[in-house]
Amino acid sequence: MAAMFRRSCRVLRSLSHFGWRSQHTKAVPQCEPGSGFSFELTEQQKEFQATARKFAREEIIPVAAEYDRTGEYPVPLLKRAWELGLMNTHIPESFGGLGLGIIDSCLITEELAYGCTGVQTAIEANTLGQVPLIIGGNYQQQKKYLGRMTEEPLMCAYCVTEPGAGSDVAGIKTKAEKKGDEYIINGQKMWITNGGKANWYFLLARSDPDPKAPASKAFTGFIVEADTPGVQIGRKEINMGQRCSDTRGIVFEDVRVPKENVLTGEGAGFKIAMGTFDKTRPPVAAGAVGLAQRALDEATKYALERKTFGKLLAEHQGISFLLADMAMKVELARLSYQRAAWEIDSGRRNTYYASIAKAYAADIANQLATDAVQVFGGNGFNTEYPVEKLMRDAKIYQIYEGTAQIQRIIIAREHIGRYKN
């Protein structure tokens, strides 16, 4: 299996981080480097996108409803995604990974989410757990924890949210007390995706006991192995949507973590945790776009099959205008995540664009899922049809990795700050 993954890496490693095109535009001759803006994907990117699309259509969609019904963790699909090189795409080449940019992973994420956002979220949660190590880990940490994920299909998780601290990350209560060459961690985390399946966690804890200490210095990021004594994994939560992903609470009781597992240094955790979102919010937005595209496609196909008052639904102006609005929204949301991904891949700070992409794509995913149910009418409210699942799955995009309201706070701060400066 590891050999298969490495072959996938060799095929896909040459992906370019420049240029893309909307999935509905015709290909045009590629522009020469430096000739200006282009929507065209490279041939390798098209191949990567096609691989993810084929996997989603042929292997995810046929079983998505059953996984949603049972809530079972989709182990066979995750193993298959790993074999195809569709997981762990951010891991640097020096540790056996693809070393892809954000736009490349967004292309994959949109296609996977089209098939099932529960499966996509399980995969994306791996990225969320890995990015803190990529931006804040040293060579030894990356080799040990990232390197082995390219040898076998392991999982990890981003362990930050608590029962009393969601959007208010600075309000977390989990404490890390240094004793000799170790830290003793005590606290409780909540809503941890992959919580019961992860082999290790990125954990954020308060290391400065002074309640007045600034967030930029009060918190430390740790790598915590899931089988460490004192780690108590809670029951799987039964959620509204994305039911096949694994979400749990985790208790840390006198968990001993060696100082070698501190990322960057004591007090650097908050910066690492927040910096992670600049890289992960564009793919989250891409996932929302994948769901929105699925909603549009399902609604359009149904409108071209169902007849009322002697003609197809799509021939009624009210429905055709609804589909037109849906199409506009999904294309604009796709552009927003592409801009955010391009900015970070170009080495620029993308906080503003990442929040715009995340907020807008999450909103339109919910709007389009609701509209798709409306087009289906009574059938849309029934589990025999796919759109009710889309409506349930969409809501979490407005909540996880920063709520819709938090994104607007960030956007307003960034926007107004430009005028003040």
From Swiss-Prot:
Q: How is it modified after translation?
A: Acetylated. Could occur at proximity of the cofactor-binding sites and reduce the catalytic activity. Could be deacetylated by SIRT3.
Which positions bind octanoyl-CoA? 167, 216, 278, 281, 349, 351, 401
An individual GO BP term: carnitine metabolic process, CoA-linked
**Which residues make up the binding site for FAD?**
158-167, 191-193, 306-308, 316-317, 374-378, 402-405
Keywords (A to Z) from UniProt: Acetylation, FAD, Fatty acid metabolism, Flavoprotein, Lipid metabolism, Mitochondrion, Oxidoreductase, Phosphoprotein, Transit peptide
PROSITE patterns, sorted: ACYL_COA_DH_1, ACYL_COA_DH_2
Instruction: Tell me the route in metabolism or biology where this protein functions.
Output: Lipid metabolism; mitochondrial fatty acid beta-oxidation
* Catalytic class of the enzyme: oxidoreductase
Instruction: Sum up the protein's function in the record's words.
Output: Medium-chain specific acyl-CoA dehydrogenase is one of the acyl-CoA dehydrogenases that catalyze the first step of mitochondrial fatty acid beta-oxidation, an aerobic process breaking down fatty acids into acetyl-CoA and allowing the production of energy from fats.
Q: What is this protein called?
A: Medium-chain specific acyl-CoA dehydrogenase, mitochondrial
> Which species?
Sus scrofa (Pig)
